[in-house]
Amino acid sequence: MRLCTALEGRACGSARICDDGGVGRLDELDLSLKLSRDEQDRRLKEAQTRLLALRLILGGQSGDGRIGPPLCVLFEGWDASGKGGAIKRLVMNLDPRHVRVTSFAAPTFDEKRHHFLWRFGPALPGWGGMAVLDRSWYGRVLVERVEKFATKEQWQRAYDEIAGFERTLAAEGMILVKFWMHISPDEQLRRFERRDKDPLRSWKLTDEDWRNRKKRPQYEKAVEEMLERTDLPHARWHLVEGDSKRWARVKVIETVVAEAERGMAERGFEVPKARRRSSARKR
């Protein structure tokens, strides 16, 4: 297992060194990746069109009429890392009757009375449906770990509980796509400052965001362990280089398309040939 410790100078771009002497997965990402507006527009439209065609097949609205496997897209990432913008462009052309977006914040009093996975069940899609989760059960091993809302025994146990949960979902046919949206500390600060100065967006910036930023080393360590222990064959993590919003949005949708195609083929559904498609560089 590679557990990473933040070193001084992280904000200046120095890599984190892991216990085994290697570099963490987050530091392997090339945050300089970007697209021109023209290339973004072309690839975004292409990927959105392809996703719509696949969704119609999965929903039984085209093709042979069979209802396809559920598709669940899960987002985690830093504050201001672009989750909302990516989600908006992911679903904007899809039939809202068959796609549901759910955002998860801190659990309510009643939700705390149950097992931590309990509250996510109603948001999961059934066959023919699609769900998008803005935050998820990974809060147990991220914010609840760092802020000590969960005991050490609870969050350590959660890795196996999450793996078993996702294994069950996959066994029932679900296509699960997991994203970690990654941005540099400097880019996060720039976005925070822009939000703070914008009267139409300042509400999105909270005192909690600033507090979390100060704890970035602790969160980075938690993220690295999460990736190490829950990146599984049936539920892979896709790390998105997010300093460029254009790059990130295209990569997200192209990745969902690729995973939907793969999942459909594995489950015996014919995947129609795409007229044209460019693939974002994978991590």
Describe the predicted segments one by one.
Residues 2, 215, 221-283:
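NTP-dependent small-molecule kinase module
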Residues 3, 34, 143-161, 169-221, ...:
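A glycine- and Lys/Arg-enriched "phosphate-lid" helix/loop adjacent to the NTP-binding pocket
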Residues 7, 16-48:
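Charged, amphipathic alpha-helical linker segments immediately N-terminal to NTP-binding catalytic cores
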Residues 36, 99-104, 109-154:
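Conserved nucleotide-sensing/catalytic segment adjacent to the nucleotide-binding pocket
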Residues 58-69:
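Phosphate-binding P-loop
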Residues 73, 174-187, 207-211, 232-251:
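Phosphate-binding beta-loop-alpha motif at adenosine-nucleotide cofactor sites
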Residues 75-90:
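Glycine-rich phosphate-binding P-loop
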Residues 95-100, 126-129, 169-177, 198-201, ...:
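Short glycine-/polar-rich loops that comprise or flank the Walker A/P-loop
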